Amino acid sequence: MARAMDNSILETILQQVRPLIGQGKVADYIPALASVDGSKLGIAICTVDGQYYQAGDAQERFSIQSISKVLSLVVAMRHYPEEEIWQRVGKDPSGSPFNSLVQLELEQGIPRNPFINAGALVVCDMLQGRLSAPRQRMLEVVRALSGVSDIAYDVTVARSEFEHSARNAAIAWLMKSFGNFQHDVTTVLQNYFHYCALKMSCAELARTFVFLARQGQAFHLDEPVVTSMQARQINALMATSGMYQNAGEFAWRVGLPAKSGVGGGIVAIVPHEMAIAVWSPELDPAGNSLAGIAVLEQLTQQLGRSVY
């Protein structure tokens, strides 16, 4: 690394970025998220050899939202042959908003990738077909990866999302009309919203996702989470599609595979080195954490890290 890591580096970066708070907007289309304190700012790092660094609000839990789409894909990879997954969802960036219907209509119900809403709903539909208790299975996976036994769903957030689910329901029904959605729409939506409503901290997220920096192997688990090839593929999808329609801008500024959520979290991977989780609830127009991206930009510049 260009500099040796320690908590003081992270604390300095947060101080440098904090003036940006107030320039973004907390997600308000989900009422339960609209009340989150927009001034929160945290970062945590878990290295491939199990060292931890953190600063700011790194221990406070928040709604991970679309970060969960990576986890649902991981579960699907453990239960389906790859060819079955990629027959129903693509591997390309969409270039459109994450909840777009237009592209889905034009491409006959096949979502561009598993990290937009349509793609994640297809993945959840697949899990409904293989798992007897999809919500419980997700909790088991997340608790094992994080090493934290009390991670849970925020039922209030899940309920709030379901009560405002018209667009996601439309996406599911549109895919059903093309034959790319097999199970009860309401049941799958409920599972999807619960996944999005997982509450985790930056520290828990960094530990959960470090397997993607370790070729699919979590350092505290005996069995691989995914194969080394699958870990590489997930990182590639995160690099091209993890930041919604701003994936190119993020690659330019930060240069790491990453996945964001409208709860203000971002998880980024430095392959073979570390997983990074940042949180700042105020979003930019694309739905990504405004200050969170700035923190990652500062960090990668100071550490001299990029996959490009």
From Swiss-Prot:
Top EC class of this enzyme: hydrolase
Entry keyword set: Hydrolase
EC number(s) from the headed UniProt entry: 3.5.1.2
GO BP annotations, alphabetical order: glutamate biosynthetic process; glutamine catabolic process
Gene: glsA
Binding site for substrate: 66, 117, 161, 168, 192, 244, 262
InterPro entries: Beta-lactam/transpept-like, Glutaminase
GO-annotated molecular function: glutaminase activity
Subunit structure: Homotetramer.
Catalytic activity: L-glutamine + H2O = L-glutamate + NH4(+)
Pfam families: Glutaminase
HAMAP family: Glutaminase (MF_00313)
Classification via SUPFAM superfamilies: beta-lactamase/transpeptidase-like
Domain of life: Bacteria
Organism of this sequence: Citrobacter koseri (strain ATCC BAA-895 / CDC 4225-83 / SGSC4696)
Presence of the UniProt keyword Zinc in the record: no
Family statement drawn from the similarity comment of this UniProt entry: Belongs to the glutaminase family.
Name of this chain's protein: Glutaminase
NCBIfam families recorded: Gln_ase, PRK00971.1-1, PRK00971.1-2
